């Protein structure tokens, strides 16, 4: 109560912050007449002036006012668009490294140009992040006109570019691209072997469009670059055949709220019998140690069948299982579930089972975007997640006032008993709206629901068309011109991802009915009457005569203006009180414009708000209403029992709905609970991922420093000496008498690992020899051996071999380490049953694994360099330069190391040249020979185990 009074007296913190920007807005406006008078050349020249001012010691804040004024004038001259005052405020929020919440249609794309231009003046590169390739291309070309006019370069990063094209795009002043492309480029860069092959040039400043979608909705999904493991498709198909025979009532239990499934005791026995009959069970029990991986795959198959639904969680396209983003309804080609779940889904759908992958590199969006020196974002809906955005990213959400007041009517939800009653109500409402040519957008939570609704409309006389088909659209236009409903609808979901921009753009045509999966981050405005740009683009194709083209454009403009008037007048007048005597009937007028109908509530209020926000742009009228049933997922899982009881008490008949603000509040509370739970999950995942992230930064930083060094000889020598110290310390304990030394063990290990037969036993017999002296002699002999190699090969070749072996070995061990961390993370939760904190246990064990990896690195690098020999080619030729190599971005394999240089163990010089990192070059290896990988182990105990 006191807080509400204070807000009325002093304004909210958001109001006060907006007010604080006003003096700078006034200053920008005051500069406008001066800039209007400048020539194009003079306006363009201001970029060089600003850069000089920065070089002279001024800060970006010092030049914000003139820089923003310059961008506004450039936008007027290139795009014919002038930034509103509220857009200037949005630009300031972005520059300060916070989130600007701006309603749909308020021009977020144009707002970004202010902060982008100002920060690009620093010359460090600005990254603008979009949710798909279409928007990246569109915005870079569209806003690039402003930047190009002001003398700045713009690049775009989309799927399918090669490294050279990516380098050129990142070298630009401003780079547009998707969150996925930025993240994958970072991972690929840290798998390369030379600095000049890396494409990114740092992480200075990023503006994330649809920031809530990327930093919250996708935060749980890591970006992973992986390589294939052995093919086990038959095993997955065998396990899948067991699933139909399991009984949900007795064999397993499903918890939809927690999205878990567990086998019952009876289910375990049933599976044991099936596995034994199929010859897949080792030992007597399903839970014997040797069956751990079998249990894991059974559980994944069970999850695939009971928790994952086709056309909701994934679709099958071109014989592949493609994941669907649960929040946006978008397909995510290239993304695969890990831990064998994707293979289980492929077996379930009877498509080709792809081999499991080994993680080569991974990072979450949370950790990727936190690398930027400054991060900001834009969205239409972030206030509901403001706490999370600040807690994790230290980003404050600032609500930017609309340029024109929102005129949309948001009506209370209608709640029905069953899905069929709900669909009947939606159909009736669609028919009423269509009869007055009011465009309708029906939002659904999944592809499955959108297609069910589409079939429902077809049964009742509606025809599905493709909004990208000129013939179909002409029918819709003709009906609108005639003032008649066409009864035509289009479906927008992940299946039609490629046409989504055009379908959305035409959803504002009179009489248009669009069924769409979640509209989060679609990025295309729905303009009443239709999209001028889209129609010009499609209807002027093939017209070469300029006069004819201009005439056609004028016709399209007139058409759209007429359509806009029709949509604005599509109001619904409802009689709320009949006429009595001389007293006229009392009516209620509901606005025209775009009518948003939600077919169910999403778990997140933000997604619902995004759907509502498609209507009412720039002060246009509009309506929104949600139609729900007790059979909807949210209602069913999170407390429909109380509502069902309430509806029963009210005596609700079939087909009747309950409409009350209390229902809305109850639903909002349910959504808040789900949001809080999801926030806790993301926060907990981040704590675990931070452990791996710290190690990742350490490894990647070390890798880059190694690539920067011309020679890693000092590093390699240090690793060699540390490794020898460890061996000697193991066999010659400190302060022990010579009689207590394990001389035989020391000699054997030195010979096994280093390939040197040193007279350690003779040295140990010398009178008065100390352990330090023994260590020094061993190090001297080993150093002499390496010096001889330098003399034999030459310093250039030695530098090349050392760096190649060090980087490749580091990469190999890091990949194995990631697998170990994944396994550790999967089981560490069980420590909670022993009253231990799983996070602390994970930190402790992950650190121990990291230390073991570093120790192994020292051993492996030392062993390989001690044993490797260069076999001269048959014909003399110059050593190839280091730049000649090919990088496989999919697997992370790089053939740069050892390119054109044959390497083989010294004691096998007469055999085929062997590359320690490429088993295909080893040929036949005897079981008791040393493993060619250089580990120092016998082949049968090393790679021979997998042969």
Curated annotation (Swiss-Prot):
What are the names of the required cofactors?
Answer: Zn(2+)
- List the subcellular locations: Cell inner membrane; Cytoplasm
- What membrane topology is given? Peripheral membrane protein
| Positions that bind ATP | 87, 105-109, 525
Please list the residues that bind Zn(2+).
931, 933, 942-943
**Region (Disordered) location:** 905-928
Signal sequence range = none
CDD domains attached to this UniProt entry? DEXDc_SecA (cd17928), SF2_C_secA (cd18803)
Free-text cofactor note: May bind 1 zinc ion per subunit.
Recorded GO terms, molecular function?
Answer: ATP binding; metal ion binding; protein-exporting ATPase activity
Provide the protein name. Answer: Protein translocase subunit SecA
């Amino acid at each position: 109560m006191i807080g509400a009074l204070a807000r009325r007296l002093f304004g909210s913190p958001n109001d006060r912050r907006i007010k604080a920007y006003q003096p700078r807005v006034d200053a920008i406006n005051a500069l406008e007449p001066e800039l209007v008078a400048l020539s194009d050349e003079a306006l363009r020249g201001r970029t060089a002036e600003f850069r000089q001012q920065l070089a002279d010691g001024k800060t970006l804040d010092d030049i914000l006012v003139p820089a923003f004024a310059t961008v506004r004038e450039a936008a007027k001259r290139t795009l014919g668009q002038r930034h509103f005052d509220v857009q200037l405020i949005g630009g300031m929020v972005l520059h300060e490294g916070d989130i600007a919440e701006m309603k749909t249609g308020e021009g977020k794309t144009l707002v970004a140009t202010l902060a982008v231009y100002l920060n690009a003046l620093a010359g460090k590169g600005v990254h603008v992040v979009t949710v798909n390739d279409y928007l990246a291309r569109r915005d870079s070309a569209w806003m690039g006109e402003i930047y190009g006019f002001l003398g700045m370069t713009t690049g775009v990063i989309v799927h399918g570019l090669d490294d050279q094209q990516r380098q050129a795009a990142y070298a630009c002043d401003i780079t547009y691209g998707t969150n996925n492309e930025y993240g994958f480029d970072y991972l690929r860069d840290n798998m390369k072997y030379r600095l000049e092959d890396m494409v990114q040039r740092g992480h200075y400043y990023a503006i994330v469009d649809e920031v809530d979608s990327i930093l919250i909705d996708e935060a749980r999904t890591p970006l992973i670059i992986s390589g294939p493991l052995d093919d086990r498709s038959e095993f997955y198909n065998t396990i899948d055949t067991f699933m139909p025979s399991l009984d949900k009532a007795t064999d397993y239990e499903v918890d939809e709220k927690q999205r878990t499934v567990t086998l019952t005791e009876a289910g375990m026995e049933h599976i044991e019998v099936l596995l034994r009959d199929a010859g897949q069970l080792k030992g007597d029990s399903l839970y014997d140690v040797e069956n751990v991986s079998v249990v894991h795959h059974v559980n994944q198959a069970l999850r695939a069948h009971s928790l994952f639904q086709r056309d909701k969680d994934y679709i099958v396209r071109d014989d592949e299982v493609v994941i669907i983003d649960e929040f946006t309804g978008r397909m995510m080609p290239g993304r695969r579930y890990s831990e064998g779940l994707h293979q289980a889904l492929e077996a379930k759908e009877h498509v080709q089972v792809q081999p499991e992958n080994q993680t080569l590199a991974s990072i979450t969006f949370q950790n990727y975007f936190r690398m930027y020196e400054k991060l900001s974002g834009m969205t239409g809906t972030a206030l509901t997640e403001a706490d999370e955005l600040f807690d994790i990213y230290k980003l404050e959400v600032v609500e930017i006032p609309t340029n024109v007041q929102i005129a949309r009517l948001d009506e209370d939800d209608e709640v029905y008993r069953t899905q069929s009653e709900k669909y009947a109500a939606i159909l009736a409402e669609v028919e009423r709206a269509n009869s007055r040519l009011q465009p309708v957008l029906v939002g659904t939570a999944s592809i499955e629901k959108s297609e069910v609704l589409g079939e429902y409309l077809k049964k009742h006389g509606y025809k599905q068309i493709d909004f990208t088909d000129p013939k179909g659209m002409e029918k819709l236009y003709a009906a609108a011109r005639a003032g008649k409903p066409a009864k035509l609808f289009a479906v927008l979901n992940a299946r039609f991802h490629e046409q989504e921009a055009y379908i959305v753009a035409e959803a504002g045509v009179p009489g248009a009915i669009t069924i769409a999966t979640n509209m989060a981050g679609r990025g295309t405005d729905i303009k009443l009457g239709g999209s001028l740009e889209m129609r010009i683009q499609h209807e002027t194709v093939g017209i070469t005569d300029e006069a004819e083209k201009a005439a056609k454009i004028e016709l399209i403009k007139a058409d759209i203006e007429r359509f806009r008037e029709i949509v604005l007048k599509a109001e619904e007048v409802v009689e709320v009180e009949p006429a009595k005597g001389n007293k006229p009937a009392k009516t209620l007028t509901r606005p025209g414009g775009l009518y948003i109908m939600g077919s169910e509530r999403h778990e997140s209020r933000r997604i619902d708000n995004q759907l509502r926000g498609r209507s009412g742009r720039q002060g246009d009228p509009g309506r929104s209403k949600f139609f729900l049933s007790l059979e909807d997922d949210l209602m069913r899982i999170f407390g429909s029992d109380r509502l069902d009881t309430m509806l029963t008490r009210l005596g609700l008949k079939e087909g009747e709905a309950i409409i009350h603000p209390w229902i809305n509040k109850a639903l909002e509370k349910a959504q808040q609970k789900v949001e809080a739970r999801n926030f806790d999950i993301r926060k907990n995942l981040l704590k675990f991922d931070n452990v791996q992230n710290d190690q990742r930064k350490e490894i990647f930083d070390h890798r880059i420093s190694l690539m920067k060094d011309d020679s890693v000889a000092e590093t390699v020598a240090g690793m060699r000496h540390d490794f020898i110290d460890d061996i000697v310390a193991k066999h010659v304990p400190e302060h022990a008498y010579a009689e207590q030394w394990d001389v035989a063990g020391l000699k054997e290990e030195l010979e096994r690992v280093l390939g040197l037969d040193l007279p350690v036993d003779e040295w140990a017999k010398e009178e008065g020899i100390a352990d330090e002296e023994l260590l020094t002699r061993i190090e001297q002999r080993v150093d002499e051996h390496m010096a001889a190699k330098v003399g034999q090969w030459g310093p250039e070749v030695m530098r090349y071999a050392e760096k190649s072996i060090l980087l490749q070995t580091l990469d190999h061990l890091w990949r194995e380490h990631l697998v170990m961390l994944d396994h550790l993370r999967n089981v560490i939760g069980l420590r909670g049953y022993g009253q231990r904190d799983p996070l602390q246990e994970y930190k402790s064990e992950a650190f121990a694994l990291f230390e073991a990896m570093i120790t192994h690195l020292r051993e492996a690098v030392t062993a390989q360099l001690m044993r490797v020999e260069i076999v001269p080619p048959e014909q003399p030729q110059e050593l190839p330069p280091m730049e000649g190599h090919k990088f496989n971005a999919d697997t992370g394999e790089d053939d740069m190391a050892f390119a054109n240089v044959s390497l083989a163990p010294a004691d096998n010089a007469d055999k085929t040249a062997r590359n320690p990192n490429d088993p295909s070059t080893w040929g036949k290896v005897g079981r008791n020979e040393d493993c060619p990988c250089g580990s120092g182990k016998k082949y049968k105990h090393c790679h021979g185990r997998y042969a």
